[in-house]
């Protein structure tokens, strides 16, 4: 044997003229099984094109050697030499995981369908509208006329308690029918007009009371007005300017 032969391949009793075969020296016990988690990145199954993933550049373009492709060997159906691909991306193919009879702890990489891998979740326009509304200008709080209406209702109730009560009061208060409510309104208006002749003779229930809204200045408006006033009244003294010195020199020369 040559000197470059590894030590574990050198036979102890080496006789001249006799050649040893590797299968006589090596034994299956010398090959250790994979330790821990084992993942294979290249796989060629029985289905051929529909059961292949990983880098199959070692085929060197001989894709007809794949099982199931001996009859139909077309280079256009296969990718280039140095491309990584997973052929199980078609929706028609069904991937069936079969455990390896030799390697018990071999785990295949998960299959990702092409329709699932290329489809992205659609972004609804509602999300964009909500974002635009959030970044929009702040809206001023709305002024409601509910307190004014409550005060008017309390005044009317106090006046009705002090005044004379007619038969139409109960019907108007319970809101029974349209005719009874109209009679109650007439009785209320007549009783109030008798007690308070200075009031205008109009039906108070038909005309809604106007909302007395007084819009006061908010804190932001007051701070803004103070800021603008301070900026307008700001006076900066930068000292004597160069133009003044030039004019003074010109006056002296004259």
From Swiss-Prot:
Keywords: Cell shape, Cytoplasm, Cytoskeleton, Membrane, Phosphoprotein
UniProt feature coiled coil, ranges: none
Annotated spans, Disordered: 164-225
Positions of modified residues (Phosphotyrosine): 63
Tissue: Highly expressed in the heart and weakly in the brain.
InterPro entries per UniProt: Cdc42_effect-like (IPR029273), Cdc42_Effector_BORG/CEP (IPR051296), CRIB_dom (IPR000095)
Stretches assigned to the CRIB domain: 31-45
Transferase found in the keyword field: no
GO CC annotation terms, alphabetical: actin cytoskeleton; cytoplasm; cytoskeleton; cytosol; endomembrane system; plasma membrane
Gene Ontology molecular function, alphabetical: cytoskeletal regulatory protein binding; small GTPase binding
Subcellular location: Endomembrane system; Cytoplasm, Cytoskeleton
Purpose: Probably involved in the organization of the actin cytoskeleton. May act downstream of CDC42 to induce actin filament assembly leading to cell shape changes. Induces pseudopodia formation in fibroblasts.
Entry similarity comment: Belongs to the BORG/CEP family.
Subunit field text: Interacts with RHOQ and CDC42, in a GTP-dependent manner, and with SEPT7.
Name this polypeptide is given: Cdc42 effector protein 3
UniProt source species: Homo sapiens (Human)
Gene name, Swiss-Prot/TrEMBL: CDC42EP3
